[in-house]
């Protein structure tokens, strides 16, 4: 009788065993599927033409490969096209990406779309240029005010603490360059009373050509100028071209911001006397990483300073400076 009962119970035990095993296998499969899911992260620059943005893109792609996430890169053609950048942000919100990394080209105009993304549960990391308020998870950027201060000291140094200069601004509403201009202007005004600002309220615009045209006009109006500060890549190259056209490259001292092949050549020839360098690859990398950290529940710093240094004709071949002048973006972008 006992033997008969044992035979009756055995199939039941076997069925229960495999049922439990199946549940455990299914649960494990769900866990693997969840952890293996790729996050989809949009990276939205101010523009897509300057070398600076290519380095940002390279950093973002490097992070995507190391962290196993998918990155979408899309931005406006021109760095003053507020409407297009807003449309790009709204498009990624509608596509329900997992996170957004944004370099806002206007510190006011992008507040609303960023707030919309955050409300929809899409975390936003701001890079390069700040946004009004703090409705984002992290801000990853250069200390732009400090960069402007460094530029002021460098220009004053090569002018011997006296002379007549231009501050050529970039674009109204661009927070990053506004802070650079502010740092430069306040330092010159406060610390160098023998330096006269001939121009301080003229905007170069977003292209090399517009910067060239403005500098051309200013050189014609103020032939006595001895030094110029320009706060980004396009304004620096535009001013350089104008100085070259007038036969003044190297004679009028030029301190600029950011790097490109032509700016490096001019630095080596002493046609540019200083370039304030950021670390755009680091900016792009950390922008993506901060989104992933937030999604994974790890702590995220509200403000991350990616550093700033001054390149001169004398130090440009030092390894640390050279790496920022010519970041190795070729494994990531063409």
Question: Where are the regions that the model predicts?
Answer:
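Hydrophobic alpha-helical segments within soluble ligand-binding/sensing domains
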Residues: 85, 140-165, 179-182, 209-212, ...
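Short beta-strand elements in bilobed, periplasmic/extracellular small-molecule ligand-binding domains
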Residues: 64-78, 165-167, 190-205
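Extracytoplasmic "Venus flytrap"
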Residues: 40-59, 63, 67, 72-86, ...
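Hinge/cleft segment of the Venus flytrap/periplasmic-binding protein
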Residues: 24, 30-37, 175-176, 187-189, ...
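Short, low-complexity disordered leader/linker segments with a strong preference
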Residues: 1-40, 65, 93, 115-122, ...
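Short, solvent-exposed amphipathic alpha-helices that sit
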Residues: 52-66, 147-151, 175-195, 210, ...
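Hydrophobic alpha-helical
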Residues: 93, 101-118, 184, 204-266
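Flexible loop/hinge segments that line or gate small-molecule binding clefts
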Residues: 107-146, 157, 164, 170, ...
